[in-house]
Amino acid sequence: MLKASNTSIEEAMRLFNGAGVATGLLVPTETGCRKSIMDATLSFRDFLHESGIHEYSNQSQGPANKVIVPARFVLPDKCVATTASLYRPCTKKGDPRIWFSKLTHYCKPTDLLAVISYGGDMYVFNMSNKEITNAFGIPGSYPHDILSACE
């Protein structure tokens, strides 16, 4: 799904790799953006595991087994609190999924979302939003200060 990104993955990763920050990437499809649901790809599952956030391989299928994780959408001037639901549905062999509450307010289909873990929360950066990517270079902005705190 990453190949559908409307933004250069290499440029986005340069920011996080330069800071030594582990990052998971997601690219919502039109349906995924509309429903706020995305497949948790293998590379994203690896990020969640390595960050100590979640291990899908230990999770049973069905709504009773979903795990809710605090998350934040990062904007240049603020963070918007939300939640991420990590689950394996009863259908489709239980392929791992992630659902962010209010995702439709934060991105468009094919936007590149970079996710980091900090202080037990998931921070979501829309790397297709130039206001957000430009803010990484501005001390005092949320993207800059969060990334600096993670170094």
In which residue ranges do the predicted regions lie?
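Intrinsically disordered, charged low-complexity linkers and terminal tails
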Residues: M1-E151
